């Protein structure tokens, strides 16, 4: 499962890239979405790679994001009780592990918003004009996306 975080704004962005961002529901900076690893999303991520950070998320980071930034309709927080009542899982951690392993999806939680509005990273970005290979934040982080998401929790 990919975690995709928008790092750059929408000024002077080509229409096709902005359209792909809309399809991914990345309308604003510091918004994060989770998408499955399949050829359709891989192509979309490849198209917007110069404006986002992405990588494979692990279960602990997903659980942390669900606890801190998970919101339901009406802007209420996602709680352990809500997960227990509305899914087959006992905790947010167990649900996050199931999502990462592909046993369930985020859509199985009713009224869960698909976009996580993150905080800007604590201690700042490494740079939003350069790729990870050049010492910045843009592009494919691989497993390193978990460190960025922890900074943005």
Swiss-Prot record:
Keyword Ribosomal protein appears in the UniProt entry: yes
Keyword Ribonucleoprotein: yes
Gene3D superfamilies: 1.10.15.30, Ribosomal protein L30, ferredoxin-like fold domain
SUPFAM superfamilies tied to this protein: Ribosomal protein L30p/L7e
Keywords from the UniProt entry: Ribonucleoprotein, Ribosomal protein
GO biological process, one term: translation
GO terms, molecular function: RNA binding; structural constituent of ribosome
Top-rank taxon, per record: Archaea
A Pfam entry, by short name: Ribosomal_L30
GO cellular component, one term: cytosolic large ribosomal subunit
InterPro entries: Ribo_uL30_ferredoxin-like_sf, Ribosomal_uL30, Ribosomal_uL30_arc, Ribosomal_uL30_CS, Ribosomal_uL30_euk_arc, Ribosomal_uL30_ferredoxin-like
Subunit note: Part of the 50S ribosomal subunit.
Family: Belongs to the universal ribosomal protein uL30 family.
Protein name, entry field: Large ribosomal subunit protein uL30
Organism: Methanosarcina barkeri (strain Fusaro / DSM 804)
The gene coding this protein: rpl30
